[in-house]
Structures are given as structure tokens and as C-alpha cells.
Amino acid sequence: MTFNLDKFQIQAIDSINKDFNVLVVAPTGSGKTYIAEKAIEKYTKQNQNVIYTTPIKALSNQKYNDFTNLNIDTGLLTGDRTLKPDSELIVATTEILRNMIYSNDERLKQIGLIVLDEVHYLSDSERGTTWEEIIIHAPKNIKFLFLSATIRNKEEFHNWIVSLRGKTDLVHSNIRPVPLEISLVGLNPHNEQLKIIKSSKDKRNNKIFKFEKQYRRYKR
């Protein structure tokens, strides 16, 4: 299956091929994961491994399954699960990577690229320092691909990355290929997607749970 790439995807992939760090800010569903796939392909073809981090275990498990289904040699490190830890691509929680850096894990010698998905978590008051520590202390030879749907003050964040990691391209798109629709869906409180939303520190999600609590009171 073939499809036309969007301008921001072409720009990001071009920067990756030039061995730059890249910060991609684009709406959910716009194709950021495809950029990551092309980056993984580039580095693994050069016999360099890749670490792909997400902020929570459920999302790491999902990405592990996604990449495995693409026939990419993929391992998983979440604390709860360890699968194929010496694979070309390791999907891990952000804290796991931070611990690998501080312990001088031998596997870092084979890493050419770190993908930090949901990098806007850096502004989280409780966990944001984990992202900062990774960006500051990761070996200087490792390149970064930063992915986010929304980053406040993205230019300021970009300049900070440049000061620490060198040449970094900022790629930004406001185009939303999938229309945003607002609707109400009843979910079991143990639903995995609901857990992901609850774990977010984005204040906009407070509206969801304010409604959820009111709805539960109404049902009683």
C-alpha cells in the first residue's frame, strides 16, 4: 500500500536522514508514528539499535505489539515485563531508560537513536525530571526523535534541546487529517484507554473525570 506523505513527514524524515535530532509536534493521528518507523529503519540498517520510550506501561505494551506486527525485531522493558531485551528496537517506559543511563547499561553502546514519545510529559510536575535527565545525561553520540501532539512554548523547548544536544530541527504541523469529534462513551473503569487518560497530567482531562464523577452520582 502506498500513500502520499505530508509535508511535515517529508521534512522530519529528511532531517533524520541528515543525522539531526528532530522535534515533531503534530496532532494525534497525523502520522508521527510513521516518522518513527522510518527512523528505526534507518538506524537498524546501520547496525545501530533504537530505544522507543513511552510514559506508561500500557502504552509501551501497545507499541511493542504494533512494532512486532510490523516484523521489527522488538523487545520490551517495563519493569513488569522483560521480553527480548537485546533486540534491535527496545520499547521501554521512560523511567527504565533513565535507570539504564544512570547505571551505564552496556546496551547503550549499541544505541544510535532514542525516541521520546509524548515528550510533553517533561512539563509534568511529578515526573518531568525523568525526561530532563534523559535528555541531559544520555551519551552525546545518541540522536533523539521527540514526538508530541502538543507542547507549550515549543520554540523555547527546541532552543533548550539545541543547547544540550546540538543540531535539532523543529517540525510542526497543525493539520488534523482525522476530524476531531466530541462524543460520550461509557467505559468500564478498568478499561486500558481510560487508565492512559487518567495517568495524564494534562489539566484538560480534568473535565472528563469531573463529568465521570457527576455521572456516577447521577446513576446512584
Predicted regions and their residues:
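SF2 helicase catalytic motif II
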Residues: 90, 95-96, 104-146
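Motif I (Walker A/P-loop) of helicase-class P-loop NTPases
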Residues: 32-41, 127-132
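Conserved nucleic-acid-binding Ia/Ib motif block in the N-terminal RecA-like helicase ATPase lobe
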Residues: 44, 48-99, 159, 169
